[in-house]
């Protein structure tokens, strides 16, 4: 029995962590924050980089997940209903591979990123980070 795809378009959702946590597969752009969120919660994705993004940074973001086996990349120009259906169907036909993609995604995540940034800001504010950089030089 083929897996039934339950697709629910919404105009706006304020609780994206809950939406992502409920998803089996995420179709999205490949902005840095989105990619980071996917890896923290360990979700597989079909990533469609935004065309015209400065220095094509979204494609670079996507390639990190693709290379790790956590996502599939589809160029915006190649995305239509048939292509999307094929990508989603291929992924849902192999639930083990889909689960492995999620695990690959999770291994890339840094759940402690906010703490690391706060620590760095504190060290910079106290002059400690500048001293460490000077000592390395």
Please tell me what each predicted stretch does.
Residues 1-137:
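Nucleotide-activated sugar donor-binding and catalytic core shared by glycosyltransferases
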């Amino acid at each position: 029995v083929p897996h039934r795809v339950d697709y629910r378009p919404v105009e706006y959702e304020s609780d994206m962590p809950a939406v992502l946590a409920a998803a089996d597969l995420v179709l999205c752009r490949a902005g840095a924050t989105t990619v980071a969120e996917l890896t923290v919660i360990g979700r597989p994705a079909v990533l469609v980089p935004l065309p015209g993004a400065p220095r094509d940074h979204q494609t670079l973001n996507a390639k990190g997940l693709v290379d790790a086996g956590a996502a599939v990349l589809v160029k915006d120009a190649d995305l239509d209903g048939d292509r999307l259906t094929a990508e989603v169907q291929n992924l849902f036909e192999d639930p083990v591979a889909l689960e492995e993609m999620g695990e690959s995604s999770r291994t890339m995540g840094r759940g402690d990123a906010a703490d690391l940034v706060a620590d760095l800001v504190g060290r910079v504010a106290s002059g400690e980070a500048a001293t460490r950089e000077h000592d390395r030089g």
